[in-house]
Amino acid sequence: MVLLESEQFLTELTRLFQKCRTSGSVYITLKKYDGRTKPIPKKGTVEGFEPADNKCLLRATDGKKKISTVVSSKEVNKFQMAYSNLLRANMDGLKKRDKKNKTKKTKAAAAAAAAAVAAAAAPAAAATTATPATPAATAATAAQ
């Protein structure tokens, strides 16, 4: 993995996006970075290790090429503005989800279920009355 400066990272990230524009994906991770290069021991803590300031570790990969950068808290605002502009420019290939079809399908299914419940309740209500009020009710009772 290549550790780059923030400006070089943004340039390489743009290249990754351009390379994967037609097919492929770019995976980006962001996490807090305390400056350690070795893992934390299981038993006990390392004494005397105090991180100077908060840092973020950004990693990006397309599956083959990996790049990373560390952004300190002092330059995070500048980096965030450049990073957000880069994401807006290169995430235009995303597909929008069609939410209207889902709501139409669920409304149609709910309407059909309500009609079935109403149809099942109508003959039962007509059977409980002594004299049918409409010809449709007589047909419903005759069908039973």
UniProtKB/Swiss-Prot annotation:
Family, similarity comment: Belongs to the SRP14 family.
Residue positions, PTM Phosphotyrosine: Y27
InterPro entries cross-referenced by the UniProt entry: Signal_recog_particle_SRP14, Signal_recog_particle_SRP9/14
Residues annotated as signal peptide: none
GO cellular component labels: signal recognition particle, endoplasmic reticulum targeting
Function (record text): Component of the signal recognition particle (SRP) complex, a ribonucleoprotein complex that mediates the cotranslational targeting of secretory and membrane proteins to the endoplasmic reticulum (ER). SRP9 together with SRP14 and the Alu portion of the SRP RNA, constitutes the elongation arrest domain of SRP. The complex of SRP9 and SRP14 is required for SRP RNA binding.
Gene Ontology BP annotations: SRP-dependent cotranslational protein targeting to membrane
Protein name: Signal recognition particle 14 kDa protein
GO molecular function, one term: endoplasmic reticulum signal peptide binding
Keywords, comma-separated and alphabetical: Cytoplasm, Phosphoprotein, Ribonucleoprotein, RNA-binding, Signal recognition particle
SUPFAM superfamilies reported for this sequence: Signal recognition particle alu RNA binding heterodimer, SRP9/14
Transmembrane regions listed in the UniProt entry: none
Principal localisation: cytoplasm
Subunit structure of this chain's protein: Heterodimer with SRP9; binds RNA as heterodimer. Component of a signal recognition particle (SRP) complex that consists of a 7SL RNA molecule of 300 nucleotides and six protein subunits: SRP72, SRP68, SRP54, SRP19, SRP14 and SRP9.
Compartments, as annotated in UniProt: Cytoplasm
